[in-house]
Amino acid sequence: MRKILIFLGLLFVMLSNIYAQKGRQAIGFGLSYVTEIESIGLGLKYQYNITNPIRLEPSLNYFIENDNVSMLDVNMNLHYLCPVGRSVKLYPLFGFTFSNWMYDLGDGFDIDVDGDHIHIDKDDDHHNECRVGVNIGGGADFVLTSNWIMNFELRYQLVSDFDQAVFNLGFAYRF
């Protein structure tokens, strides 16, 4: 019985040490550029390491109006971190996106559900298109201090009729 308790105690200590290496979190912000509406955006992100190399990153970006078009973009991406140096990690990414495109069209009110998007026309001359799509791309993390990282990311959003590249420069605080 004593050997079993010692074994279980050691197993608990080892598993808690392994768990401590996982679960690293970060919260950050970024500046983005999208090619479809040619606009600059501001974003917030949260990062959670499921395992040491696998990271989950939900993010929210708002792209400033350009030629009467603005966009709100919600993403859920998965990164696989590959260290290439002491302070640099490269990662491919795959994820999903929900984007809301807002622009002026004309008068009228209309709601259409067409496959993968919702089309809304309102009486106030604003038009919204909500679409769901897939993100593919990659990025690089650069360690600035023990808690701060900088990243550069390029992803391509495959969204029906709204495919676009997104360039992002961001900073995150790890805790």
What name fits each language-model region?
Residues 26-29, 117-124, 151-154:
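Extracytoplasmic loops and strand-loop junctions of Gram-negative outer membrane beta-barrel proteins
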Residues 1-24:
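Cleavable N-terminal export/targeting peptides
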Residues 30-42, 63-71, 86, 156-167:
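Solvent-exposed loop/turn segments connecting transmembrane beta-strands
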Residues 3-4, 56, 156:
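Hydrophobic alpha-helical segments, especially transmembrane helices
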Residues 19-56, 60-63, 174:
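Short glycine/proline- and aromatic-enriched beta-strand/turn motifs that initiate or cap beta-hairpins
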Residues 47-115, 131-132, 142-150, 168, ...:
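Gram-negative (and chloroplast) outer-membrane scaffold detector with strong preference
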Residues 32-34, 46, 62-66, 80-82, ...:
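Outer-membrane beta-barrel proteins
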